[in-house]
């Protein structure tokens, strides 16, 4: 198919004078970068908690058990995982923008609940709402960018999306750590969250446009092949396809789950691990910053790199690097070595994160892509719950260092599975 010339901002005229969407980052750059900004605010919402909330659990609510202290992450992960699936399905049925705005409406009360919480149950409930917010809003910004750019720049688009989200996670985590070191764990660090939620909601409602016309255009022009069936499967068929039947989608789903198992570990256990080593709040904030910051920045290159080199081996190598970084983290001591291992963990995650999303987009037909992304993200974000529970139970039984090392070994095994089982998904040029 010949790409039509761009005569409008993001569409051109067809033979009948109607508007035909043009796929590509350049043709849709205004909406694309607006969605990047929106996703930065989504990421900043979860970054609020990464430095201070595990410490609030211990110091303000007296939760000595690591599994109890990490319960908020498990709750967040389960809710976000289920909401991811709903977001994809609802977006395919009712349009992307409505789902995005709904996600922000649910997110507005989150920082207020944390500020006012008289008991730990309030924190857990706030993370139920945060899981819904992240599942609806982050999933939808991912799907909308895939809609806009088409197949040729899918990896780059996912890299830029995740760059914005996780750099914002890092900056928010560092900022809350700095504020907490000066004035306390609550309420001041969470005032930032009120601003993030209001700005994200305003941009989504007032400036973001829906992308369903791009979806219909791509679906009409997509040539079906063995894996990209033009018939839209039922939800049950799609769930089985993504979860275990298709080797590429299954490989991506298990790697995504283990990847976020690591992130759940880092979110919940790293601040406690570093605090037990005698580090200050400012140093803990710096270490909470370096992992998602490296992850976020490196995705600018790794997403586009997968468009050139392919998906499979970047995913396998990234999982192996993450696992080795976790094992190394418990073998060293001191802020500088931990900064290095945190950066290596971030690079490994950056190799994997946007590439997995791009691989899902490679395999899924445009007509059911949103649902496929939602199912993949369901499995991926269940990793938060699995990671929090596994890390907490292992830490209570064997110590925090043993928990971190054990999850590192699991991560290397996941990378080996990808190397053996996953076919290359990048379309032939």
Where are these regions (language model features)?
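Short amphipathic helix-loop junctions that connect adjacent transmembrane helices
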Residues: 52-66, 268-283
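Structural signature of the two symmetry-related core transmembrane helices
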Residues: 98-112, 313-328
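Pair of pore-lining "gating" transmembrane helices in MFS-fold secondary transporters
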Residues: 27-55, 245-265
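Helix-to-loop junctions at the C-terminal end of transmembrane segments
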Residues: 83-95, 180, 298-310, 395
